Curated annotation (Swiss-Prot):
Highly expressed in roots. Expressed a low levels in ripe red fruits. One of its GO terms (biological process) is defense response. GO terms for molecular function: abscisic acid binding; nuclease activity; protein phosphatase inhibitor activity; signaling receptor activity. InterPro entries: Bet_v_I/MLP, Bet_v_I_allergen, Plant_def-hormone_signal, START-like_dom_sf. It is an enzyme of class 3 (hydrolase). GO terms for cellular component: cytoplasm; nucleus. This is Major strawberry allergen Fra a 1.07. Gene3D superfamilies: 3.30.530.20. Belongs to the BetVI family. The keyword Phosphoprotein applies. Phosphorylated in vivo. Phosphorylation prevents its activity as ribonuclease. It comes from Fragaria ananassa (Strawberry). Possesses ribonuclease activity in vitro.
Amino acid sequence: MGVFTYETEFTSVIPPPRLYKAFVLDTDNLIPKIAPQAVKSTELVQGDGGVGTIKKIHLGEGSEYSYVKHQIDGLDKDNFVYNYSIIEGDAIGDKVEKISYEIKLVASPSGGSIIKSTSHYHCKGEVEIKEEHVKAGKERAAGLFKIIENYLLGNPDAYN
């Protein structure tokens, strides 16, 4: 099994504590509300929302996929770090066992956030991940962060 790692960074004008609350801690409620084309709903399969929790995320009509199962691997609320894995679903296909992510929100000098994302694709056998697949995933993630950022800018009292 090969593991391919990709890193990317985004920036946001929203400070880490507020962005973490919205993107990580309340994502199951917020994303279907502000981006139903991306996520239709989230169903708790196992756990209480902490480490080890498994959720089935029903993707929206704007997605080419129908669902993913998402496992929470780590939550560090003090340092704004979130680790999770996509462990099942048509989005990972038959060549990937799972995709693990580490998201770190770091304060930027301007008062916003630097979002550092590391993705680990755990492949079945000696499969290589195509660059366009990774690029598409990065673009979806950046787009979702922008939707959240715009929501927070338009709702200054939310998630304070």
